[in-house]
Amino acid sequence: MNNSMILLMVIASFVAGYLSTMNLWANSIGDIRLHLNDFYMVLLMVGWMIVMCYILMKSHMGITKTQLIITITIIIIIVYAIRTQAFIDDKQYLNGMIPHHSMAITMSKWIVNRTKDPRIKQLATDIIISQQNEINEMNSILDERKLQNKVF
């Protein structure tokens, strides 16, 4: 496999990964946002994919040791960026938390109808209300400061 095919695989994997992030779970299409934490996580997944391809399919992939070292270095940098929330400002924070809260609403809406445990049903109902209130508050701040990062 030549370098252009490896690059194509990496790009395709990145796009597929980015489309499969928390936004997929959003309760509302208006809660879908682009933000750095998803970008970091997808880069991390793609990095690990390259490492696994090197380990498992070294003879087929054509990935050099130099490329592997560069990839591992990038993985370390990305892990550092995730753990320290590098470059995450107010806008990135709020636009990252909205799909996270929206996902909690989606999960809670489903469990409310499936559980027989009244405590879980009440907890899920409380989560739906509180998370929606927090999404509304975050949207108000983003609107007020003109920081919206909506996709749709």
Curated annotation (Swiss-Prot):
Q: How does it sit in the membrane?
A: Multi-pass membrane protein
Q: Where are the transmembrane segments?
A: 5-25, 36-56, 68-88
Subcellular localization: Membrane
Q: Which residues are glycosylated?
A: 2, 113
The main location is membrane
Q: Where is the signal peptide?
A: none
Report keywords, A-Z: Glycoprotein, Membrane, Transmembrane, Transmembrane helix
Quote the cellular component terms of the Gene Ontology held in the record: membrane
Q: What is this protein called?
A: Uncharacterized protein L153
